[in-house]
């Protein structure tokens, strides 16, 4: 389990007592919850498979993006203030653990695509059955509804499709 250092340094913030379960990749989702952690929220990051792909971004073109110990600076920045768990939510055991985490969470934050969330059972409709008061925060490239609602996006793409 990862446990990145908090920017709070032991100080309480306005979100102290708020529990956020995050299942996100790259920066959009994880970066948002890192800021909420700066404000005192407890963040539990779920990773599956090989982990968040941002873990492996140690070089972009000729730019070295690694820490002195070889880890991704981007991943470190996006995942400060978090506890982490590796969980395969496609298995019954993984689903059971996920449900336990969501039962008493205040927020579930994700940036996965719509069909992926539905397939994994982490869409709002599925999670509200486990915790009716859950806030389902979703970061998406093209919004929750519309002709491109199931497309993923990285920052360069959003410059092509202004709001």
Model-identified regions with their sequence ranges:
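N-terminal helix-loop segment corresponding to the beta1-alpha1 unit
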Residues: 1-163
């Amino acid at each position: 389990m990862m446990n990145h250092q908090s920017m709070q340094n032991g100080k309480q913030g306005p979100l102290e007592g708020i529990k956020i379960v995050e299942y996100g990749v790259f920066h959009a989702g994880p970066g948002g919850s890192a800021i909420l952690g700066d404000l005192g929220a407890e963040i539990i990051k779920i990773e599956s498979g090989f982990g968040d792909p941002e873990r492996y971004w140690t070089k972009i073109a000729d730019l070295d993006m690694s820490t002195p110990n070889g880890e991704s600076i981007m991943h470190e920045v996006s995942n400060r203030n978090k506890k982490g768990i590796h969980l395969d939510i496609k298995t019954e055991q993984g689903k059971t653990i996920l449900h336990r985490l969501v039962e008493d969470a205040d927020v579930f934050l994700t940036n996965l695509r719509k069909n992926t969330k539905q397939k994994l059972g982490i869409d709002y409709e599925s999670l509200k059955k486990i915790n009716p008061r859950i806030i389902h925060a979703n970061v998406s490239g093209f919004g929750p509804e519309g002709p491109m609602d199931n497309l993923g996006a990285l920052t360069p793409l959003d410059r092509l499709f202004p709001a």
